[in-house]
Amino acid sequence: MASPQNARSFCSGVIANPLRGFPLLGGTALLSLAAILAGQELLRAQLKQLTPKISQTELWRVYRWSIDPQQRREAALLLVAKSKDSPLRRQRLLAGQGWGSSPLAAVALKLQAQNNKRLGGKSKANQLWESLLIRFPNAAATADAYYYLGRQQPELRKQLLKLQPAHPAALESAIELDASSNQHQGAIHLSRWGIHRPGTAELLRSACNAPFKDGPSAKERQDLAIGLAKLGDSKAALSCLEEQPAKPAAALAISQALLRGDKEQKLQAESLLLQLAQENPEAKESIEAANLLSEPLHPNAALLEALPPSLAERSPSVASARVRLQDGEKAESVLQRWPDNPASWQLQWDLAREALLKGQWREAKSVLKSIPTKKLPEPLAARQQFWIGFTAAKQGRNQEAKQIWEKLLKSHPSGYYTWRAQARLGQADLPELSGEQLSISNSKPELGEWTSIESGDELVDTLWRLGLTTDAWETWLNLRSETDLTSDTPNNRVVEGRLKMAVGDYWTGLSQLWRASLRLVGEDCQTRQFLHRSQHPYRFWPAIAKASRSNDIRPELLLAIAKQESRFSPGVKSPAGAVGLMQLMPETAAELSDGSLNKEELLNPQTNSKLGALYLTSLLKQWQGNPWLTVASYNAGPGAVTKWLTAELKEDPELWVERIPYPETRIYTKKVLGNLWSYLRIRSEELCKTRLKR
């Protein structure tokens, strides 16, 4: 038994060294903290990522019960994106979501401010704008705070123009700036960052008309001239320079505008381009000038000879033009030197098409095979493979043609050339396009689940994932003005095209996706199929389905026409005067409707699609259901098409369409029929063996 003294000695020994326990306690605390943090990370890793494809019920469950506050906020924002017509619900969902330093906090504060403004709470909205400005001065979401608070504090508007020059709020500020000032700073800003903003053209012209002494500087006039040229007003652009020489960028922009004009303007453009190339042979604009001078099928030999040798030598466009002038001589060396260049791709097709139309099958095949398929973008590779198969069939090598076409069908999404391959193989062709006997599905097809944007920026990707597409687009614009995202790469075109379509700009968005498809080389099957589906939206489906039912015509044909005519943009007006979703001439529309229509009626997608369907029905009846003649007539008119009727249409319709003398109608017919086949097949097409994911 220990004595009390020994016990006291033992206890005192322990108490006498209190520091001995601190490392143990501290280590235990640190281990506990590490375990908690690791556990939180593990739980977060196990949490389901929220996307628009998650059901409303599941979102509400996550919003209420998730252990992760960040996920609860994401659920709230996704629910907000789905509750655009319910400001009171949005207010409840957004309450308290502006916590922390995450970029999503800035977005939540912005949405709260906008919602309070919508509900009439101006004072509360201003408080939120001020909080947003203080906490997140550089966030894309804060642009609206600079704009609204800038009404009382003009200095904030000036800061906005510098910080986020491409943001819609900055562009609106620029317009309002010129309305209250005669210094034209808004016009100068718009010439650099927002030439397509409504009202910009008038502001740019006004700035250019200001006296040179008190108006824009010489450098600013160069920018204004570029803006006007990009808007198509070459005359105002030249006038804006006040007789000073155009810098390379301005000279190129003005020349591009002039090339779209009459014969005299085209000659003026050629002179400007040649001057640009001769005076600045090393400038990047001179490469494009050489491309433009080389572009026609029948280039001007004198202009090409006048180009600086150092510039001409490194230009595949100039080399291709010289091949054309020499009737194809030395084509092989050009195609082998620049197999990755669009100028070579175009030269290859021009020479192959010429040989095909002459029935020179061996020559056509040789030219078509001069660039490996793997070097070509998907649409051009499909064209190449179809015609190689065609030349084999024409030479009696039917088994070889069959193998080529079957391979084409396995590796390319549905389009014009896969349709023709299937027709040649006897596997499938177009169904009847009109008539009471049609079995028409009026249901909009489900084309797969939501897909990610993969922009390369985490915030843009997150906002897209949460259904906040406008915020994703504005954040992307902010990035474009800060980084090298202005580089016009195919991948950036895909991202920007999808964002544009998501915010309602189908005209630009579809164009960017198509241009991307003509530059992407070597993409995997899933990317190829995804890009193809992205280019075939079902916008205005209710109006198109109704027009289809009313006229017993396939809705896929209406979609195919609308995509090519207006890119699903009802406000578009052609230079010839055609308007609306289906691009009808007012005279044609009046005849179809038994009376004149005002502008608003003709721009209405429901009215326009109904009249377009009626016109197509009459054309199908006139041509006994022939799709080639119907589509060509929609573009060029039945009178012109009547002159092109030959036996070749039945025997080799692919060659018949290539003989159409109007280049616009030739391309139009192939594109619309390709669109039609895509829409007909898109419900069932599964090109890739693995499931499409992005």
Q: Language-model segments: which ranges?
A:
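Catalytic and substrate-binding regions of cell-wall glycan-acting enzymes that process beta-1,4-linked
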Residues: 630-685
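Secretory-pathway/luminal and periplasmic proteins that interact with or process carbohydrate-rich
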Residues: 414-416, 430, 521-523, 567-573, ...
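Substrate-binding/active-site groove segments that recognize
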Residues: 575-597, 607-618, 639, 672
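Short, contiguous acidic/charged loop-to-helix segments that flank catalytic cores in large enzymes
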Residues: 529-535, 572-576, 595-607, 621, ...
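N-terminal Lys/Arg-rich, disordered targeting/topogenic segments
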Residues: 1-18
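Short, functionally critical alpha-helical segments immediately adjacent to catalytic or ligand/cofactor-binding
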Residues: 545, 552-570, 612-613, 630-635, ...
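Alpha-helical solenoid repeat scaffolds
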Residues: 3, 17, 23-547, 556-563, ...
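Glycine-rich, acidic and aromatic/proline-enriched surface loops and short helix-turn segments
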Residues: 362, 370, 564-567, 581-594, ...
